[in-house]
Amino acid sequence: MPRMTQLDLIRNFSIVAHIDHGKSTLADRLIQLTGTVAERDMKAQILDSMEIERERGITIKANTVRIDYPAKDGRTYVLNLIDTPGHVDFAYEVSRSMRAVEGSLLVVDASQGVEAQTLANVYQALDAGHEIVPVLNKIDLPAAEPERVKSQIEDVIGLDASDAVLISAKSGLGIPDVLEAIVHRLPPPKGDREAPLKAMLVDSWYDAYLGVVVMIRVMDGVIRKGDRVKMMQTGAVYGIDRLAVLKPQMVDIAELGPGEIGVLTASIKQVRDTRVGDTITHEKKGCAAPLPGFKPAQPVVFCGLFPVDANDFEALREAIEKLALNDASFTYEMETSAALGFGFRCGFLGLLHLEVVRDRLEREYDLDLITTAPSVVYQIYMKDGTLQELHNPTDMPDLTYVDHIEEPRIRATIMVPDEYLGDVLKLCQDRRGIQLDLSYAGARAMVVYDLPLNEVVFDFYDRLKSVTKGYASFDYQITGYREDFLVKMSILVNDEPVDALSMMVHRDRADMRGRAMVEKLKELIPRHMFKIPIQAAIGGRVIARETISAMRKDVTAKCYGGDATRKRKLLDKQKAGKKKMRQFGKVEIPQQAFINALKMDS
């Protein structure tokens, strides 16, 4: 069984890149070239284990692989690669993966240049004190402009890119240079073997056979199979059943020393018991203080998930419980809706996280789901001095008791080609944005805006992509809460409020949102035998109304000629019947109407 490795022969690194700049392909090539995985087992995106990761071409969970590399100087180095997500929703996964390694490869597409997410992740790498090696990928494309992109890296990020490694991950060109750069330009880890054990919990996932598998980076001390270890945040103590390194499959190892990255299993039942970023130490003679920088992931966007068929509720509950085993940042609680029946109110890190969870539920568990409009967490300050958090617009307290409402704001960074800048600025202004900064890097503008998160969760990303023909890239950080004039808008169908369609809106945009919603519902709800009013209301005041006219039977058809009062009598009788029908009749709103109404383009 392999023993631990000397510190000066270890290199821990991550790959930082925007979506689609070739990060997972580069990881594949490094694994392939060093023979870590046999040729027959190789497949594209080998580190992306979820089907949805391969299909969308994105990395969601941080994955790791240990590569043995015989360098040109005659020594064999151990390279630990942590493949991090590139998307903003998973920024916490990125931040703690960054703390587990000492260096980063910054991969930039030589034809596209620096994008917004590249920036966000590079800043995290710099915060973690990384040495960064720039790598220009896709240099064999006809549109590649390595010199322009090098100067862009220097202008926008401030990194010296003169000795950037030029590669094509797809064809394998330049990959040996990357391996040499990792060995010679990235620093070895520091650590003291004799000190008490201090290891950082980088990630954890649920395995049907092993229970929870925990990925750790040892900072100080040595961890061995059979040790009893303690999680410093939760105080839980476990005995280690198995220690291994990932190549990407598990290979057992006797011990892990400073600077090494590996996995352990210890009969842990739930992923929730292992807080990512937590510090692991020995139960006896443990370290004095935990590692800094731990914070539990907070859900930011909430929405309701309901089964289309009410009989699927139990299946949905089981699916959500299984999914939550593997995703500690996803929260859920039961809720009932008069319109949609039983379902769950779920919390997510962001919109992509929401989409990924919904897709996984539908695909892996074969469910049909309705998603209610996403909402953010509002802070409601009451007149009696108390503070309430509002996750669901239907729970909004009576306005007479409310002093003011605060909403979360974000700092959005948008990189956009110059010719689309005007459209992007207009979009941000329409969404109540405040411009903070505007700068240029070559032919691309970088705009920084302060925006309300509420305006972004709905369809901001889709609108941004459509006004820039897909060329803009967008990244955000949540900055805090600020007071604004927010109101709850209810939708009434036949004078009955429909809870699933109520939403929080800004007072200035309420009329427009309300009008758009009632017009859309008028198209979607089928006609009934009586007329149906559809209203958007704030409190008791109706701000928009449409009426679906009734279907009408010709009751006077059998009156040929004759007295007009005879016809009048029949029409009055029909009218009275319709009035009674409207009073007692129930309006059937088809499920498809909900789905389409919630997709509403604002």
UniProtKB/Swiss-Prot annotation:
Primary localization class, coarse: membrane
Subcellular location: Cell inner membrane
Catalytic activity: GTP + H2O = GDP + phosphate + H(+)
Membrane topology: Peripheral membrane protein
GO-annotated molecular function: GTP binding; GTPase activity; guanosine tetraphosphate binding; ribosome binding; translation elongation factor activity
Top-rank taxon: Bacteria
Start and end residues of each tr-type G domain: 8-190
Keywords of this entry: Cell inner membrane, Cell membrane, GTP-binding, Hydrolase, Membrane, Nucleotide-binding, Protein biosynthesis
Residues reported to bind GTP: 20-25, 137-140
Short name of one Pfam family: EFG_C
Keyword Cell inner membrane carried by entry: yes
GO CC, alphabetical: plasma membrane
Keyword Transcription assigned: no
Enzyme Commission code: 3.6.5.n1
GO biological process annotation, one example: positive regulation of translation
NCBIfam families the UniProt entry points to: lepA, small_GTP
Functional note: Required for accurate and efficient protein synthesis under certain stress conditions. May act as a fidelity factor of the translation reaction, by catalyzing a one-codon backward translocation of tRNAs on improperly translocated ribosomes. Back-translocation proceeds from a post-translocation (POST) complex to a pre-translocation (PRE) complex, thus giving elongation factor G a second chance to translocate the tRNAs correctly. Binds to ribosomes in a GTP-dependent manner.
HAMAP family tied to this protein: LepA
Record family assignment: Belongs to the TRAFAC class translation factor GTPase superfamily. Classic translation factor GTPase family. LepA subfamily.
Official protein name in the record: Elongation factor 4
Species name: Cereibacter sphaeroides (strain ATCC 17029 / ATH 2.4.9)
